[in-house]
Amino acid sequence: MRMVDDYKMVLHNSAIVINNCSPNDFPTLSRRFHIYDPVRHRLDPLGIYYDQANRKLYMPRGIDVDFVKRKVQTSMEDEFTSTVVHNHQYGYVTKKIGMKKRPRDDTQMEALKFVLCKDKYQRNSGKSQFGINLNTGGGKTFLCSCILSYLGIRSIVITAQSGILDQWKVRLQEYTDIEESEIVKIEGGPMISRILNGTSTLANKSLYLCTHSTLQNYGSTHGWDKIGELFKKLGIGIKFFDEAHQNFQNMALIDFAARDVWRTYYVTATPSRSDRQEDIIYKLYMKNVPSIDLFNPEVDPHTNYIAIKYNSCPKPADVNACKNSVYGLSNPPYIDYLMRNERFWVMFDYIFSLIYKTGGRALFYIGTNAGILKVKQRILFNYPELYNDIGIYTSISEHKQEDKNKKYILTTTKSAGAGEDIAHLKYSVILAEPFKSEVLARQTLGRTRDPNTTYIELVDVGFKQLIAYYNAKKPVFSKYASGSKVMTVDNPKLANLGEETRLSIRTRFRNVLEFNVHGPIDAITYVEGPKMMPAVYFGNNSLNRTLAE
């Protein structure tokens, strides 16, 4: 009887394995999964993995099998053999999980039929990979909860950040009646080792949560075959990749290591990569993976896009200092330049004053931690009463999760990127973190989930690279924003805005207590004598109190 390794090509649920080979055996096939690194001037593999010790090439299951077969056959002199592996060994949840909520609309109901292969989607019941490409706020976590409840198969959720795992746990307990003890967060290599050694009591739970970095660190240290053993030990039958477009290579390695897991769901609102080369390979990776995208341009857009163009008037030396020979513009020196540019601060004061007057929570994107601290200082200088309302949501904050609940949040696109759930945001402001990526544009647009919200982008036309960034993202906002508006601030208008803001702040500080004190104040009562005396004096006589015995 033939063993699996005796076949030249083996089809698993989430991988194609070519045995006894070298990547040089079929260069045209291998080259399609390599990208050029302009910094190190070399080709790096992406979406594939070659096990040199065992002479095995791992490729994505979503590509055309016949195409791979032809390429492998042309490199062989011996007979070509292949087989399909159906090794579905998984565990079930320890207790039936019920749903607390029903699908909120027809869109969620249609998506639910897709993920469970019901009605017209029954043809996908033999598939092992599915793409859930719903828009931000479309209920992707709810659908995954329904999958766990309906199928009752042990599952694992894999995300980029530990904080996102906490969001998953909260949402799963909100949508289902799963017991908290049945949700296990896998943290660190020692915990994985205990599970593999059989010395942990956590190997028979219903749902596991883990980050890409935890699995990547353990796999690169102990071998990726250990990740496959981990999934078998836990009885994992379903794996969910949250924000599947991120950590692409790591996701592929997990797919290859845990290639016999029954089903894999790739969950993302933006099934694309920012880099063009990487996006081509990502699309190839997902080519034959059935997916669903129910975006409705008549109903789903809910955030208005406003581009505010101004000229920071950089000197030639400033432009040269911000240049990058590979990427065109280097963000850190550009942001440092903005922090020293008076025109930028005029625009910031104007934008912040509008948000302050209209009310509502706001998220500001600033590309560096140094820039974030400068912006915070500026706000506190002009609005000292907001000391407890400003949060920094990056690694420099000791209370990062608490700061995410503040009224005004200063962050970066990396810290508050894909998958972040920040409730009741009214404004998202791209203040000092320019980017060209259409994927990032959709992600940042998706941070405001409530209706009638606003997305503001400050565009510095003094740099030609930033004009190109703005033009590259326009199609995204045309499609996914509820409306688009462009506001141009020329030099005279900018001067007027600066004067208006200066006078407004001056007026605020003239009667500072009127801004900082809300309602009547009970002054101190003195009982030393019968004499009537004013105890506390304010700049405004209406706030004075006369105190009696």
Model-predicted regions and their roles:
Residues 124-147:
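Walker A/P-loop
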Residues 152-174, 369:
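Conserved Walker A/P-loop ATP-binding site and its immediately adjacent core
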Residues 203-220, 404-417:
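Conserved two-lobed SF2 helicase motor
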Residues 246-300:
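Post-DEXD/H (motif II) to motif III coupling segment of the RecA-like Helicase ATP-binding lobe
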Residues 292-355:
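Conserved interdomain linker/interface between the two RecA-like ATPase lobes of SF2 helicase motors
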Residues 454-509:
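A conserved SF2-helicase RecA2
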